[in-house]
Amino acid sequence: MPRRNLLKGFKRPKVLEFLSENSSECYGKFTASPFETGFGTTVGNCLRRVLLSSIQGYAVTGVRITSFDADGVAHFISSEFEQIPHVREDTLEILNNFKRLRFLLPQGAESSTFTYEFRGAVSLTGKDFAKKFQLEVLSQDLLIMEMMDGAHVEVELHVEFGRGYVPAESHDRYADLVGVIPVDAIFSPVLRVRYDIQSCRVGQRGDYDQLSLEVWTDGTVRPEDAIAEAAKIIKEHFTVFVNFDETALDLEDEPEEDDPAVLELLNTKIADVDFSVRARNCLLTMGIKTLGELTRISEQTLANTRNVGKKSLSEIQGKLQEYNLRLGMADYNHVGVVSRLMRQKEEIDEA
């Protein structure tokens, strides 16, 4: 039986803040705070390892290269050590280039095979292997091979959806396919992850952790989606260690919110606050229904939201100040203090 107050006093982040500066489809920087001392490093290291090893993506798992002579007679390239006639690069180098290609298949596709035919003197790059509505190639400028006069080759690519790194010898299903050369598959779309821990202040304490996380991907998955997938993987692996009914646990987000007046304030509906029609509609469109939910949104996140201009942002901040609240709150102690002082003043006035 767990202690009902198991998480009492634990500071935990309420919002993952996306820093939009220099962000792109391939790069994102995020911050989360506050963490108890040491928890920022624990979470950051765990996320980094899972991001680099366990996010799913597409990769080439097998290649069949057929060379044709002047009479049109076909010959399968039997291994990575056999040279392709009238092609400048070694076959091993060409296979390594195919391994570096980054793909996207139509949503839901687990695997597919694509066939191409090339003739004459031409430099083949990633864009030459794209198939409209079937295969999107993101590394379009990657040089695959240079063909010379007299070259005539057919290339068959086997593209699959997978996780992590899978060596060529694991693709034993190609053993019965004549001419298919299995290759090492690098499925991970996450290229690099860096995290940093800084101190942050909550109330009178300045020893909490703030986690900054930078993620670089190949463009087949957005950085924020990769983080979400990594967090889900970690969460599912820890579930087996919980040997009690979590509904019996008193999951207090912030103990200082137990003050009835604070809870009442944070549960105030956005529709009941004197916002302008535009500001209210923007918040409701974002799915923000109460003042408590609004205080957990960072200023940067709100400013980057569509249809929230400077005027609306200023209005929202001003209205929160009237309630002794602000954007990006993690500590409600002062709200409780102000609430108690106001109640004491009302009691004195009534007396």
UniProtKB/Swiss-Prot annotation:
One of its GO terms (molecular function) is DNA binding. The keyword Metal-binding does not apply. Its EC number is 2.7.7.6. One of its GO terms (cellular component) is cytoplasm. Homodimer. The RNAP catalytic core consists of 2 alpha, 1 beta, 1 beta' and 1 omega subunit. When a sigma factor is associated with the core the holoenzyme is formed, which can initiate transcription. The N-terminal domain is essential for RNAP assembly and basal transcription, whereas the C-terminal domain is involved in interaction with transcriptional regulators and with upstream promoter elements. This is DNA-directed RNA polymerase subunit alpha. It comes from Treponema pallidum (strain Nichols).
